[in-house]
Structure formats: structure tokens, C-alpha cells
Amino acid sequence: MERLIYIEKIKIDDKTVLGLKVELPDSPPLLLMVGEKGFIMCGYLNVEVAERLQVTAAMVSGVKSFQDILEAEIKAATSKARELGINLGMKGREALRKLA
């Protein structure tokens, strides 16, 4: 199977975030959307480690596309993300506005 990595610029209002999608064998893709202040990750990545590293990050789950991330609810967030106003249950699009 050919594995592919996709990188895409995505507009959120007047800002741009970077989307990274890695196709994986026999599983959903690994997804990440990165803004200037932090990032949203899919459930493959570990929020507890992000917290220990003191980064600004939030996590969504059950996503297969960038559009899914925008529509998904935040399931976990580091303390630095919460300081920016990113709360559990917030939509990914709203969180990215704060991270862009």
C-alpha cells in the first residue's frame, strides 16, 4: 500500500492553519491542525504527554478529515490551551480560532 502524507493550508476566518494528514495502513488517518499558538490533534496523540511538555494542545476523536476536526468537539485540552479559552465540548473550528 502506498502511504501518503498530505499538508494543506486551511483558512479560519482571516488566519491560516496548517493541516497534516498521514494515511496509515488498515486504520483511520493521523490528523493534526497547527496554528501559531498551538494545535489540535486526533486521538492517536497523547494529551498527557502534551501537558507534561507544557504545550498548547487540544484533542478530538473519531475524525477522518480536516472538516471532521472543524466540526468535532474538543475531548481534552492541556492547561495552556484552557488558558486560551479552549474548553471541553467546544467545536474544533472555535478552538482553532484561538490557536491560529
Residue ranges and their predicted role:
Residues 2-100:
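Residues that scaffold, gate, or flank divalent-cation-dependent active/transport sites
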